Amino acid sequence: LQLEAARERFAERRQQIRVLDKRAKEAGVDSIDSLADLVPLLFAHTNYKSYPEAFVDNGQWKHMNIWLGTLSSHATDNIDVADVRDIDEWLDRARAAGHHVFASSGTSGKSSFLNQSTQDRDLSLAACLAAADLSTPAYVPDHSRSVFTMMPPRGTHKMIDFCNVLFPRWAAPGEFHRLSDYPMRAFEAMRPAQLRRLLATGKVGPGEIAAYEAEIEARQQARAGEFDAWMDLLVSRRDRPLYVGVMYGVAWQIVQALRARGIKDGDFHPDTLMSFGGGTKGAAVPTDYKEQIMGFFGVTPERITSSYAMVEMSGFCAKIQPTESYAVPPWIIPLILDKPGETLLGTIKDTGQVEGRMAFFDILADGRWG
């Protein structure tokens, strides 16, 4: 069934997505007759950041529309770019036109932009919620907890939409506590690399660089104050059932901050739930940071909402206890590749176990190639 669905998707998307058609011609693939036929057609993250940086630097938003259209199933010429000032306004206009584009974190200095249709967004949110519930089956969202999350209410990261529907289901009235309401903006992730380019070409001067650095310092100071206030709230609520949703790097930061305040390991309500994600994002952590975090909050595996996913996926692969395995949704076709990412190594059905680079094809994707 998966192979047949992939075959149908390819035949449909090849007519809609210019880059896919070009890739298929270069690879000599005319139909999907085996999973191996998908491999040369897979898009890497670099495809979604293949726009010339000059488009963003020079405010050439019509060109960004055209670029996005080469990777999208639906026409993007309906995105109104009149008076757009920066990348975040372009993303807002795209969403208003039915293109729910989300940005990567842009740690390399150049963000990826992946298109989602409204159907993609709605189905993905439902799938993510189902996976979250599947990983903690003994607990039901009942608006009874003090909820703490690092995710702001607005921004360009895909997980913001998910957190906006996940956490309110658990929060008691008045007990939904965000680290900050400051939006997560693509512009700020891209700005340092952009300034370096513009400085090299003489388009900005030292004064603009100094102003940017002062802005960053002020924001860091504000963030530190927000974090301290957030810790005050967490300490005051620790005797209640909690739901704490953070990335591992922030979780470790919480552990350090509260230990410095004299909070002991396990000094939290025994029914506390947690969810983690995103890795440590370069934070300096000890090798046993996961064990220390769990011990500090006193949580056990069955009280952790856990999954495996990439932002490109529709939904998550829920972690199943007590087997410590992941439930792959039926619309995700896992493909285990060799190190160069060019050859399919086989399937679990063939050998029982396959080890290699993880790739996947998402049958559910509507707004782009899966």
Where are the predicted features?
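Short, histidine-centered active-site or binding-site loop motifs used for metal coordination
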Residues: 106-108, 278
